[in-house]
Amino acid sequence: MIELQPVDELVVDVAIDNLTDSYSSKPAHVSPEFNNVIQAGAQALSDATLCCAQLSLSLVMTASTGQHRHKLLFDAGPEGALFLRNCHNLGVDLTDVGAIAISHGHWNHMGALLDALDGITQGRREVPCHVNPGMFLERGAQLTNGQIAPFEPVPSPDALAARGAQVVNREDARLLLDGHFYLSGEIARVSSFEKGRPDHLCRASANDPWALDPLIMDERYVAVNVRNKGLIVFSACSHAGVVNVMTHACEMFSDVPLYGVFGGLHLSGAAMEQLIPDTIEHLKPFGLQQIMPAHCTGWRALYALLSTFGESVVTPSAVGSRFTFH
């Protein structure tokens, strides 16, 4: 039995996401970007004080139990200066981040990691950085015209260590920060229709040939048990398929009610959009009270989720938003 400690409150600051949206009305547990930057000290709403959207998802998650607080950075986004700018504008203090967890080895989730480490450690301490060996393969994609587009390499374990990371490079699941966060191990692929990303490639080095890598087996998710609500699953891209992710989480925590899922569902792009109807149908049995789509979910999937589950359940993410669960 995994002893994931229940938390009294979980605050999730969206440091990076694909979209910016402060105008749409939000439910009570979501504070929009405009409110957050003014609260952080901005004297006016301007280009300099607002957040910028990018192709990624980065979450700063603060779990509180009594007088104890634990802060986790889940992914960092593609570009360091923008990550640091957004955190500054939101008033997100990085110096008390207790650990970093990375979802998978793509440039747009790890590219900002070295600068994030600088912001966290200030050159004065080390911070655990949880990864797994599969994240450090070279990655690429086959374009519709047949060309191969290599992805920018992610920082190596040595590069991370040189910037203050205590690199924890293992494949297994683990509890983080006194048991307040769960980082999964490998996610079993069990659904009949979630077959991964067909255009995805990998290779061990630049001297090796590209090989098909649709399943992206290095992907991991984070889960938090919020007292009086239940388990919230954070899946940055859901390359494993969000139904597989939720099935795995239910099996790992069969004694904890499932409350919600937050993250990219990777249902955008011609091949992945075909999975939207099956995904919707297979999400229904989980009885989710909150679905918080982000990043790579795509507008067609978002429309389908809203049409099926309604606005009381579906709350889209946006950069600069703050979600509070208690």
Per-segment meaning from a language model:
Residues M1-R69, L183-V222, V226:
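Zn-dependent metallo-beta-lactamase
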Residues D13, H130, Q166-E171, Y182, ...:
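General small-molecule cofactor/ligand-binding pocket signal
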Residues A48-L55, A63-A99, L114-D115, Q122, ...:
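Pre-active-site segment of Zn-dependent metallo-hydrolases
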Residues M61, D75, C87, H104, ...:
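Divalent metal-coordination and catalytic microenvironments
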Residues F74, L177-E186, I232-S235:
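Short hydrophobic-aromatic micro-motifs
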Residues C87, V313-H326:
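Binuclear metal-dependent phosphoesterase catalytic core
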Residues G98-V168, G185-G196, E281-Q289:
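Active-site HxH/HxHxD metal-binding segment of metal-dependent hydrolases
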Residues A99, H106-M110, P128, D208-V319:
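Cap/insert and terminal regions of metallo-dependent hydrolase folds
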